[in-house]
Design a protein with these regions (language model features):
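Hydrophobic positions on the alpha1 helix immediately C-terminal to the Walker A/P-loop
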Residues: 48, 52
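Conserved lysine of the Walker
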Residues: 45
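Hydrophobic anchor at the beta1->P-loop junction of P-loop NTPases
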Residues: 37
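Interdomain motor-coupling "hinge/lid" segment immediately C-terminal to the ATP-binding subdomain
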Residues: 2, 154-156, 161-272
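Short glycine-rich substrate-engagement loop in P-loop NTPases that contacts/grips substrate
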Residues: 68-100, 118-119
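Accessory nucleic acid-recognition modules appended to NTPase machines
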Residues: 225-384
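Pre-Walker A adenine-sensing motif
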Residues: 12-29
Length: 443
């Protein structure tokens, strides 16, 4: 347990804005496109929707004009398919919104008088993939001008295929990730004293230990700061995702092999992973399965947004390599809830944190290969490109030569950077930048 992670305010997740996502949504509000929040369960999509509702009301939108459906609530259990969804929305706006729990408290309060909606209307649907054929209702909402639509979902494959089928060119996807370290610090500051403040370097370093240990799910900030409590919560979140979004959805018969695969993936964060390598490992453990089964299981885990895969890129040949992707976790806290926190895994964990930070900043990420040497990350966004090496420490000449030397082999003029936990290392070496990891994360 890290003692300074106290619990002075338990409602933290409900009042800290995640401005990155609010700005992305608001850029498309009142535009004829569906706003799609895609992210793993418990990354905060529901809270983002509630914050959006608050902003709409602050702009003068009546609560009667806002329909919020959360499919994790039994209140909406009767909405089984697209027909139910469409009828519910039409009835809601036609006959009045004062029917109880169809929206957050602020909306139902604003809609206290039964009245039909007048003016622009808004439809927000949480965990939309739980409604069969939902895309048909959403397409009809657009065609009929019934309302401005925001939806969220936690299955990448399901959302992508259904959006492409009926809503091609009429939606914008906004990925939602666990808290970045900067967001984590905002939550922690608000929890301590209800507002933003300047953190000392020592405080930032201590909070980074919390972040490294517990990850970035917003829900951890509502719980007592004890390992047994937080790791139990994280393990419960992981089990919900695995059994609801993977085992049940895909009708996996041998849950034991699937569980062992998940443990293998979580245990090899930041390592090159292939189905053949996993199958060979299982064989050595006298576990019988096939490469095809492993491939299917990995695709299911990836679709649940628990993991990401980064392809390898031949820098000299300028082509993606077909095999040997690296696996990264959406949230390292879930890993520690499953297999515990281990100091010896620090390099892979730091790589994972930088990978997720780059993702949150909008970069497309691959793993570089040059002269059979590896570059941890190639991060690309529009015309911008960065080459990045990540390590725990640069305490030896061998480490310095390895991290900087690999980058020196790349002869283009794009930015090259080594990120480490060395706070006082020189700012550059032979034109290659060095950044202290915590400073990089707080930029």
């Amino acid at each position: 347990m890290i003692e300074t992670m106290d619990n002075s305010r338990s409602d933290i997740a409900l009042f800290v804005d995640r401005e990155r996502y609010m700005s992305a949504i608001e850029a498309f509000i009142d535009r004829p496109v569906v706003k799609v929040l895609k992210g793993m369960r418990r990354v905060g999509k529901s809270v983002i929707m509630r914050l959006l509702i608050e902003r709409l009301i602050d702009r003068g939108v009546s609560g009667a004009n806002i329909l919020y459906i959360n499919k994790e609530s039994l209140v909406f259990d009767a909405i089984k398919d697209y027909r139910d969804l469409y009828r519910y929305a039409v009835d809601y706006f036609k006959n009045g919104a004062a029917r109880g729990a169809s929206a957050p408290a602020s909306v139902t309060t604003a809609a206290a008088a039964p009245a039909s909606a007048t003016g622009r209307t808004y439809i927000l649907i949480d965990e939309v993939q739980e409604i069969a054929g939902w895309e048909r209702a959403v397409a009809s909402f657009l065609a009929d001008g019934l309302g401005d639509v925001v939806i969220s979902g936690s299955n990448a494959t399901l959302l992508s295929s259904e959006l492409a089928t009926l809503l091609s060119g009429r939606y914008v996807e906004i990925p939602v990730y666990p808290l970045t370290f900067r967001e984590f610090m905002t939550f922690r500051n608000a929890k301590r004293d209800g507002g933003d403040r300047t953190d000392t370097a020592a405080e930032a370093e201590n909070e980074f230990k919390n972040y490294l240990r517990y990850g970035g799910l917003p829900g951890i900030h509502q719980l007592p700061a004890h390992d047994d409590v937080l790791f139990s919560y994280l393990n419960a979140v992981l089990n919900t995702i695995l059994y609801k979004d993977v085992i049940t959805r895909h009708k996996i018969r041998d849950a034991s092999i699937f569980d062992k695969l998940v443990r293998y993936l979580f245990d090899n964060v930041g390592n090159i992973t292939t189905a053949k390598r996993i199958a060979d490992y299982f064989k050595s453990q006298r576990i019988r399965t096939s490469v095809d089964t492993i491939l299917n299981y990995i695709s299911y885990v990836e679709a649940s947004l628990l993991i990401d895969k980064a392809p390898r890129y031949d820098i000299k040949g300028k082509r993606l390599l077909e095999f040997f992707d690296k696996v990264f976790l959406n949230d390292i806290g879930l890993r520690h809830g499953l297999i515990g926190y281990r100091e010896e895994d620090i390099n892979g964990l730091l790589e994972n944190i930088v990978f997720k930070e780059l993702q949150a900043r909008g970069y497309k990420i691959s793993i570089g290969v040059i002269d059979q040497l590896e570059i941890d990350f190639i991060a690309e966004k529009q015309n911008e490109k960065k080459y990045i090496q990540v390590c725990y420490g640069l305490g030896s000449e061998a480490a310095i030569e390895r991290e900087f030397g690999n980058l020196e082999k790349i002869k283009d003029n794009y930015e090259k950077m080594v990120i480490s936990m060395d706070r006082f290392f020189p700012a550059e070496r032979n034109g290659i930048l060095h950044r202290y990891l915590i400073d990089f994360l707080l930029e």
